[in-house]
From Swiss-Prot:
Glycans are attached at N46, N71, N283. This is LysM domain-containing protein ARB_01155/01156. It comes from Arthroderma benhamiae (strain ATCC MYA-4681 / CBS 112371). Keywords: Chitin-binding, Glycoprotein, Secreted, Signal, Virulence. The keyword Calcium does not apply. The lineage of its organism: Eukaryota, Fungi, Dikarya, Ascomycota, Pezizomycotina.
């Protein structure tokens, strides 16, 4: 990613870089292997382009930067325009319709020069003596009135707006009139030559996907021409430069010899990594031989290392991208063998979300409301690329967003789609028996979920004695309930399990939860606020029979049964 301040500071530079060469002096054969194409295709992609390198690279993502007059005039030369056209033609001739694989995405090789050419055409639009890109940076449209994102967040009529409880109300919906371009901009601006040219140029993009968003743009442009009493010819792209995600093709023929490895292996990836990615990931250099790797990594003797990997010649170079290397043989090598440790489970998968997320953008009918994570679609996205990014299948993505057709032709840019459902997990419970305290026998208390991580000490007050309830309590992602159990002179509790001791608390109608207690720090709960990431609470000083009422902005409230009383979070120091 180019630094954001690059373009705004370009006018300060006393020189320009007169040539663009995207791969520089990298080895063509290595690049061809990594992109799964020919060296002739890579040579065409890597040819020198007669454009200022800094502004040309920035033009490939033109909307990311603020353009000055010096930036635009440096880029927009006739030599650069001709060179970009020649570059695109050369890649078409050398690569044809043969796809390349880059970062797991299968696409036409021509998509690379087209990215730069599209940016050049947009930045270099003119109306008379004016540069439209510079003008467009000052355009302002009308504000669209929308409800705050937390307008309906609690589900409580006391706090949420009355509209939240009306059937069919959608706080993120946009009024039909607000979707019209003619309603968002003043007529003098919308009908100006630059405005129409820029909008038309967007429609000419080779990366504009077929589907609902493109149809929306075409509809708006036709509406604008009618509104402005003008006519401008245009045609949307018919080519598809993105073909989807790479799939692994299994080789035919005899399987390789079966070997057993007692140590870690370098496993092939799907899609396969390029040579550069492999060397970066495993800290080896291109051209390393098996003998080199043995000396660097293996604990086994060289004959055992070669045998474990079915290698005939120790100095044979490693040329196959999908070749797995065994570091240690099956027998116990000198110095001992490596024993892999079990993985530590941490909720990172798409299904491990325990609360409903708030969409970052409008959603359309068909997206499941029980969604743990949303993704806002941007230009160039497809169903399979979104699924690949979030580690789910396309079928799973479509099941979470049933309005999307099988061809993924109605994916809308700037709309939010669900990529992970809310996962409901039944937490196992354990029973903890409490020892006898000095002033009474404490009854068994139903306690916490099985520990996941961390360590915290919880205490209860029995008469005037502080008794440790559970030494190995755990930090968890969920909330346990609270129940009152009678003891001779004290209270036994089933405590809430929280992710972290924090700063906010929401309590209502404690119903005299603090019975027979003194003025001591205590936590008084009747409802628990579930936030998107963590639940946060802090101890407060309460009096017998008192209830604390404080609204925390934005949480979703889930009622839980409350049967008890006092929780002391290790406050006696």
């Amino acid at each position: 990613m180019i630094p954001r301040n690059l373009i705004s500071g370009l006018f300060l530079l006393p020189f320009v870089v007169a040539e663009l060469n995207i791969y520089g002096y990298l080895d063509l054969k290595t690049l061809a292997d990594g992109f799964h194409t020919t060296t002739a295709c890579i040579a065409a992609l890597n040819q020198t382009v007669d454009c200022d390198a800094r502004t040309a690279v920035a033009a490939a993502v033109a909307d990311t930067y603020y353009w000055t007059l010096d930036n635009v005039t440096t880029l927009c030369t006739s030599q650069c325009q001709q060179s970009l056209t020649s570059w695109t033609s050369a890649v078409d001739a050398a690569c044809g319709n043969r796809p390349i694989v880059e970062d797991g995405i299968v696409k036409l090789a021509s998509s690379t020069p087209l990215t730069y050419k599209e940016g050049f055409d947009l930045v270099c639009l003119k109306s008379g003596d004016s540069w439209c890109m510079i003008e467009s940076q000052e355009w302002e449209g009308s504000d669209i009135l929308k409800y705050p994102t937390d307008y309906c967040s609690t589900g409580d009529p006391e706090y949420d707006g009355p509209e939240c409880f009306e059937k069919g109300f959608d706080q993120l919906a946009i009024e039909a009139g607000d979707e019209r371009m003619t309603s968002l901009y003043e007529k003098d601006l919308l009908c100006s030559d630059c405005f129409l040219k820029v909008f038309r140029q967007r429609l000419l993009s080779p990366f504009l996907l077929k589907g609902g968003y493109t149809s929306y743009l075409v509809e708006q442009f036709q509406d604008m021409q009618s509104y402005c009493s003008t006519s401008m010819p245009y045609a949307t792209s018919t080519s598809e430069v993105f073909m989807g995600t790479a799939t692994r093709t299994m080789p035919t023929g005899s399987p390789p010899p079966t070997t057993t490895c007692g140590g870690p292996t370098i496993q092939p990836t799907d899609p396969p990594l390029s040579c550069e990615a492999i060397t970066d990931k495993y800290n080896v250099t291109t051209g390393d031989s098996h003998s080199d790797l043995h000396g660097e990594f293996s604990l086994a003797s060289k004959p055992r290392f070669l045998k474990a990997n079915a290698i005939d010649r120790q100095h044979e170079p490693i040329e196959k991208l999908d070749h797995a290397i065994c570091y240690a043989g099956t027998s116990e090598p000198p110095g001992g063998s490596y024993e892999s440790q079990p993985p530590v489970h941490q909720p990172t998968g798409a299904s491990e979300y325990y609360t409903t997320a708030i969409p970052p953008a409008p959603t359309s009918t068909g997206t499941t409301p029980s969604c743990g994570r949303y993704y806002e679609v941007v230009a160039g996205d497809q169903c399979n690329t979104i699924a690949l990014h979030f580690g789910i299948t396309v079928d799973a993505f479509l099941s979470l967003n049933t309005q999307i057709d099988e061809r993924c032709s109605n994916l809308w840019i700037a709309y939010a789609y669900c990529v992970a459902p809310v996962d409901i997990v039944d937490q196992p419970m354990t029973i903890v028996d409490q020892d006898i305290a000095t002033q009474g026998n404490v009854l068994p208390a139903t306690e916490l979920p099985s520990p996941r991580m961390g360590r915290v000490v919880l205490n209860i007050m029995i008469g005037s004695v502080v008794t440790q309830l559970l030494e190995n309590a755990a930090l968890s992602m969920d909330i346990a309930g609270v129940r009152r159990t009678s003891a001779q002179q004290g209270i036994v509790i089933r405590v809430p399990v929280i992710q972290t001791l924090a700063k906010r608390v929401l309590t209502v109608r404690a119903d005299q939860a603090l019975q027979e207690t003194k003025h001591v720090p205590a936590l008084n709960l009747a409802h628990v606020a579930t936030w998107r990431d963590i639940v946060e609470m802090e101890p407060t000083t309460a009096h017998p029979g008192d209830a604390i009422l404080e609204r925390a902005k934005g949480p979703r409230i889930h009622s839980i049964a409350l049967y008890v009383t006092v929780l002391y979070l290790d406050l006696w120091i």
